[in-house]
Amino acid sequence: MLDETPLAPLGPAGLVFMASGQGSQKPGMGADLMDLPEVRETFACASDVFGFDVADLALNAEPEKLNDTRNAQPALAALSVAVARALMARGVEPAAVLGFSLGQISALAVSGMLADEEAFALVKVRSELMAEAAAAHPGAMSALLKADEENVRALCEECAEGDVLVPANFNCPGQIVVAGTPAAVE
């Protein structure tokens, strides 16, 4: 449950909300927040847009079902927006809102750049297109930790063995995500 004590701004820049991308989902996420009216309202809005009970999905889906991009994205987007709405209803206002990958859409909703319904509609199309692309062109990704670009590029060339294997995301110093065919990523 959210602590009802207001948070003090963190230094001169203030508080920043960050919405995560796909991959951070897990069954039961948000369970301790579902009694909050803002959370229920946000999940109800998402359910209306997606055409299924997004709260039930987030709370009760088996990991394999929740990890399907058509399910992970709606659940994560709804939860990210819901948490922000609950905090803001309690006087916690962000100085900035950021998002990583899928979280960029949640950040647009939280910042007021998109209505929640518009953001969820965008997530619906995004998740469907990504699922179609993945089915047509199976691929895999893996994050490499304590990695540098030169060694990752060399590793990709060495391990590709005729398949596709490339550095795809330079997340932060020391973390590089590689992507390619499932066999090459293995």
Language-model-detected regions and their locations in the chain:
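An amphipathic alpha-helix/helix-turn recognition signal
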Residues: 41, 75, 101-102, 114, ...
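Helix-rich "cap/lid" substructures immediately adjacent to catalytic or cofactor-binding pockets
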Residues: 2-98, 178
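Gly/Ala-rich beta-loop-alpha elbow adjacent to hydrolase catalytic centers
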Residues: 80, 95, 99-103, 107, ...
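Conserved short-loop catalytic and cofactor-binding motifs
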Residues: 30-31, 68-71, 107, 140-143, ...
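Alpha/beta catalytic cores of group-transfer enzymes, especially the acyltransferase/condensing modules
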Residues: 22-24, 50, 111-186
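Residues within well-formed alpha-helices
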Residues: 45, 79, 83, 105-106, ...
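A general structural motif at alpha-helix termini
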Residues: 61-62, 101, 123-126
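Short, electropositive, low-hydrophobicity segments enriched in small/polar residues
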Residues: 24-27, 32, 55, 103, ...
